[in-house]
Amino acid sequence: LQKYEYHVPFYRQIQQYRHLGMKGLTESTLDGWFKKTVELLKPLYEELEREVFSCDYVQADETTVPVINREKHRADKEYLWMVRSVMEKLAIFHYDGGSRAGAVIESLANQYNFKGYLQCDGFAGYETAFKANPDVRLLNCLVHIRRHFEQALDENREMAQHALTQIQYIYKIERQCDETGLSYDERRLKRQELARPIMEAMKVWMETEGIKYSPGSQIGKAITYAYTRWDNMMECLEDGRLLWDNNLAENVIRPITLGRKNYLFCGNHEACLLYTSPSP
């Protein structure tokens, strides 16, 4: 609980125990207990992993973790992955030597023969991993697309604001669906009726207006980013369960960010691997 809920490093836990009169407890003792506990939890973690990938709609995200490189006497920026089953609200963390390569998530999905929707941010590694796999249908994140247009407001307010307004309309439709308590199928039909024309018009707008701006400009970058992911976003029109953004996945990762501020780094790759195993 102290380590995973409150993100308290072992050395600080020992200080707390000493204040309570337990002066013989050492960091190596806690570390030993921790490793044995992780070993006992391993079958449960593997079953959770299987359960997540047996679902047909998951979200994935990655976050950084500093890991000490003793040869170079520095902390290297490594990556750990999170995969969340949206409908079942289960999540797992995965560490593969700190790699952010798309092969990591591809290997995980293949290991459990995953078939379904995988929602992610705009990281190109997902596209590389699954572009040749017809069983995995990628979704992207409308919030990430919106952020790029927000960054272009100062450079080209008219163009950026047009895109932001269309995205706002899409979320307004979703709020109406939420407020009226529509079923997933009713939501799909409502999206087909109201959101599809917006999505299709936006695609045409990007095709016709995007070529007028330099790819190096802020608005050019925003349009390119959105356009290359727009077909993936269109998947949301076909299934009322699908979300327009990856926000819930980022919420799952947020405690890791908090922990990173407390423990600062992992001592080695093994420590990071141990850290991810019981995280769910």
Residue ranges, per PLM feature:
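Conserved beta-strand -> loop -> alpha-helix junction used to position metal-binding or nucleic-acid-contacting
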Residues: G122, N133-H162
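Short active-site loop/helix that positions an aromatic residue
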Residues: Y126-A132
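Short, conserved catalytic/metal-binding motifs centered on acidic residues
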Residues: Q13, D61-T63, L118-D121, H144, ...
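Gly/Pro-rich turn-and-neighbor structural signature
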Residues: Y11-L108, Y184-M234
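Conserved small/polar residues in nucleotide/adenosyl-binding loops
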Residues: Y275-P280
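Short amphipathic alpha-helical "interface-anchor" segments enriched in bulky aromatics
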Residues: L142-F149, W244-L258
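Basic, short loop/linker segments at the boundary and entry of helix-turn-helix/winged-helix-like folds
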Residues: L1-Y4, M22-L25, A271
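Short, contiguous acidic/charged loop-to-helix segments that flank catalytic cores in large enzymes
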Residues: G240-L243, N262-L273
